[in-house]
């Protein structure tokens, strides 16, 4: 059985992440596919949203992908162990072009921590410098939240999340950010 998946911090989920989600779905073809949200949370400024809240918002923001979101394993090795236990033997991580090289390490665990007949890491595509989502990043979104800049924050959030819920997410991010975050 084949599976195509992605794994990311999504802190917070943004309109830019939708491009990755679409690429996973397209790459999957007749294979199953999932989007794994990391379990990382901290007060340092990189991971302000609690995993359960992040999953809640991701499902509201991207209802067409909601049944494909998973939250559980803490890293790619844990994900692959889980997928193997579900009967998958052909796995492919679909990640942003800037993450492909950094994810290659996972292959060295094939045959040790898990066993896949086929295991690969591919790009979901290059970021389009002229596209609407190029300027959106989790870091910029967290900075907008800390600056209490709702207009900038709102631009990175899909319209499927209403203003009230967008503001609530921004407030949750603010409450978990260090005071001097830049």
Could you describe each region identified by the protein language model?
Residues 4-182:
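Nucleotidyltransferase catalytic core that binds NTPs
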């Amino acid at each position: 059985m084949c599976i195509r998946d992605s794994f990311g911090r999504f802190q917070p989920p943004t309109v830019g992440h939708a491009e990755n989600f679409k690429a996973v779905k397209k790459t999957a073809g007749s294979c199953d596919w999932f989007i794994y949200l990391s379990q990382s949370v901290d007060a340092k400024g990189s991971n302000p949203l609690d995993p359960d809240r992040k999953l809640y918002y991701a499902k509201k923001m991207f209802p067409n992908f909601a049944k494909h979101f998973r939250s559980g394993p803490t890293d790619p090795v844990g994900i692959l162990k889980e997928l193997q236990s579900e009967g998958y033997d052909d796995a492919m991580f679909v990640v942003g072009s800037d993450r492909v090289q950094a994810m290659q390490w996972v292959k060295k665990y094939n045959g040790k921590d898990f066993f896949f007949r086929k295991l690969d890491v591919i790009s979901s595509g290059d970021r389009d410098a002229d596209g609407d989502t190029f300027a959106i990043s989790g870091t910029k979104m967290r900075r907008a939240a800390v600056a209490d800049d709702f207009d900038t924050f709102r631009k990175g959030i899909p319209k499927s999340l209403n203003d009230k819920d967008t503001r609530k997410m921004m407030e949750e991010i603010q409450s978990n950010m260090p005071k001097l975050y830049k």
